[in-house]
Amino acid sequence: MFTGLVEHIGTVLQVTEKDTTASGGDGVSMVIGDCSKILEDVQLGDSICTNGVCLTVTEFDMARSQFKVGISPETLRRSDLGELKPGSKVNLERAVKADVRMGGHVVQGHVDTIATIVNRRGDGNAINFTFKLRDSQYGKYIVEKGFIAIDGTSLTVTDVDHEQSEFSISMVSYTQEKVIMPLKNSGDSVNIEVDLTGKLIEKQIELSLLSYIKDETSPLSTLIGKLVEKKVDDVLKRN
């Protein structure tokens, strides 16, 4: 679990399409450097949120200035990590500790989809970004003043246009210095993880409704039965 408060900006040093080494897992791997600041207490097998994606550390260099991660096909489908190349900058955050304040919000590192920056404009000392979701079904989980993780950064939604599958955020000057988004422009992609709370509520309601519908003695089934009977009676009376 992560907080969405980026600790460090690293640099992609190497991307291997088919890494046959023990630490590569016979798939896509990535080496990220310029990050000794966050590697002091990280062990092999630990998780590091990389541009919003929870990735497992599989290798260090001797100086602990860089680390390797493997990237699964599912991650490549869901995120934009496949677009990264040597020189790309990435947001990094270590997994949260029990004694860390939750200054952002609960971020799993499980990216749902990507979005494209469709507008960027200055607003005093802030930068306002507008994004368009690739997969519109995730728009229902995005609400004004709610949380959202963009490239692993915990941000507050300022506006939502559900019909266009678009939403906006405003980034204050302090955050601009700590994350990679100010380096991006219109047309660039970002990783999106919607707030888990909305998903949990939706699933609980869905399962509860299904349970009530299947139970003929439940209050909901009784109510539906009465409504259907009333509708049928009304139709018969008109005929």
From Swiss-Prot:
Keyword tags: Repeat, Riboflavin biosynthesis, Transferase
Binding residues for 2,4-dihydroxypteridine 2: C54, L55, T56, G70, I71, S72, P73, E74, T75, G109, H110, V111, K145
One of the Pfam families matching this protein, by short name: Lum_binding
GO BP terms: riboflavin biosynthetic process
Disulfide bridge partners, by residue number: none
Group of enzyme by EC: transferase
CDD domains with a match to the protein in the record: Riboflavin_synthase_like
Keyword Repeat appears in the UniProt entry: yes
A single MF term (Gene Ontology): riboflavin synthase activity
Lumazine-binding repeats: 1-105, 106-205
Catalytic activity: 2 6,7-dimethyl-8-(1-D-ribityl)lumazine + H(+) = 5-amino-6-(D-ribitylamino)uracil + riboflavin
PROSITE patterns in the cross-refs: LUMAZINE_BIND
Enzyme Commission code: 2.5.1.9
Record pathway: Cofactor biosynthesis; riboflavin biosynthesis; riboflavin from 2-hydroxy-3-oxobutyl phosphate and 5-amino-6-(D-ribitylamino)uracil: step 2/2
Residues binding 2,4-dihydroxypteridine 1, per UniProt: G4, L5, V6, S154, L155, T156, S170, M171, V172, S173, Y174, T175
Induction context: Repressed by iron.
Biological role: Catalyzes the dismutation of two molecules of 6,7-dimethyl-8-ribityllumazine, resulting in the formation of riboflavin and 5-amino-6-(D-ribitylamino)uracil.
PANTHER family recorded: RIBOFLAVIN SYNTHASE, RIBOFLAVIN SYNTHASE ALPHA CHAIN
Record note on quaternary structure: Homotrimer.
Protein name: Riboflavin synthase
Recorded name of the encoding gene: RIB5
